[in-house]
Amino acid sequence: MAFVLTFFPFLSFILSPIAIMVHEIGHTVVLWLFGYPAIPAFDFANGGGITMSDLERSPSAVWAWAIGLIALGWWRREHTGTLVGLGAAALAYFWMFNSTRETLAITLGGHAGEIAFGALFLYRGLTGWGCRIELERPLYAFLGFMILFGSMRLGLSLLGETMEKHWYLQGKGGIDNDLVTGAQILSWRLESAARALIFFTLLAIPASFVAASMRKHIGAVAEAEEDL
């Protein structure tokens, strides 16, 4: 059903607000990570969504992340793996901070958000983690597949000379679309960016199944499994 809704435009329009919002939440999260206050919203003027931000960095937000990272490191100080992960995250953050890499992360954060939410919803559908009633599981799985299929559909539409590609290249509100900007930053062709999107979207599906098979090790299981 998710496949049908994805590849039939009229039907995909019905649930498109969900994909739009998770896309904008992705941008919002990355903006906040780098200290830019932002709010996800629907764009009623030009269609789709928009992430509202004045792109003025807030030093207090950056310091809040730093303090949080230090506090988490202190709390988990006896777990070497956690400390290594936090150290790697801090190095990656400073490597990207206030650079073209930061701009790239913000630009592609929307598509990363779609893939992350799609994988998370699929994981919840497979495991029942966080579900109160059994009916939630197929709904989460449906939403996960719908978001991921939608991401793949966009990537596939940009590989050839399609009408969707023509409209995508027009941008929105005088601003280039995310993959166009990302390709320019990376000095890639748009088709290469589209292939990367397809690859990471496809990767999210088996990754969700692998994570589900390791759910007890991860610690994110359904309530019924918690006491087993």
What are these regions (language model features)?
Residues 1-14, 28, 32, 66-75, ...:
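Active-site scaffold of zinc-dependent metalloenzymes
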Residues 4, 88-97, 143-155:
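Aromatic-anchored segments of alpha-helical transmembrane domains
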Residues 32-37, 68-72, 116-126:
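Membrane-interfacial alpha-helical segments at the cytosolic side of multi-pass membrane proteins
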Residues 53-64, 104-119, 192-201:
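Membrane-interface loop-to-helix entry segments
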Residues 77-90, 107-115, 133-141:
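Cytoplasmic-side transmembrane-helix entry/capping segments in multi-pass membrane proteins
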Residues 122-228:
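C-terminal membrane-associated helical module and adjoining short loops/tails
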